[in-house]
């Protein structure tokens, strides 16, 4: 079992060269990533079915593999994702939670828990996954920043 978390600083209030994102902008970006992860990772295709205003089931396909997940949104706070149903897929869950220790000082805490499978190879799969998660999350925050600075959220959604 891999259990891992990391934090990304979104706003550096001491660096005037970086635009300060609002909590709403950050939330819009994180929610967009949850609903349409294929806009953040071109190797994916995604479809989803709404269960309620803040909950949906999504299917993410990459190559010949598909993953089925339940996603629960707590608006402007966190997004929780958990695999569902199919016994052929690994059990996994993740959370992206906005933290604001002081006004406009935004961070996102990413938490992951997943099975690693029975692969006993010499490669440390857990360390590779941790590195991949950090890179993907950093790229997502960078993309959210570009969308916010360029006022492109509405175009990205369509």
Language-model features: locations:
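Short, highly charged C-terminal tails/helix-capping segments
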Residues: 46-47, 145-158
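Beta-strand elements of well-folded, non-transmembrane domains
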Residues: 10-12, 64, 112-116
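Hydrophobic ligand-binding cavity/cleft-lining segments
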Residues: 1-49
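Hydrophobic residues positioned within well-ordered beta-strands of beta-sheet architectures
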Residues: 4-6, 56-58, 69, 81, ...
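Glycine-rich portal/gate segments that line the openings of hydrophobic small-molecule binding cavities
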Residues: 48-87
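Beta-strand/loop substructures that line and gate deep hydrophobic ligand-binding cavities in soluble
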Residues: 86-138
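Hydrophobic/aromatic beta-strand elements that line small-molecule binding cavities or substrate pockets
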Residues: 8, 45-48, 67-73, 91-100
């Amino acid at each position: 079992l891999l259990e891992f978390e990391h934090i990304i600083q979104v706003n550096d209030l001491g660096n005037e060269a970086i635009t300060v994102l609002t909590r709403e902008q950050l939330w819009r970006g994180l929610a967009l990533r949850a609903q349409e992860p294929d806009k953040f990772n071109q190797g994916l295709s995604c479809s989803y079915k709404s269960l309620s205003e803040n909950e949906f089931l999504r299917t993410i396909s990459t190559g010949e593999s598909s993953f089925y997940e339940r996603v629960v949104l707590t608006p402007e706070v966190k997004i929780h994702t958990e695999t569902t149903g199919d016994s052929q897929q690994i059990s996994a869950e993740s959370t992206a939670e906005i933290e604001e220790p002081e006004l406009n000082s935004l961070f996102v805490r990413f938490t992951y828990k997943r099975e690693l499978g029975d692969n006993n190879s010499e490669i440390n799969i857990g360390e590779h996954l941790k590195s991949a998660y950090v890179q993907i999350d950093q790229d997502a925050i960078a993309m959210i920043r570009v969308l916010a600075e360029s006022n492109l959220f509405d175009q990205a959604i369509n």
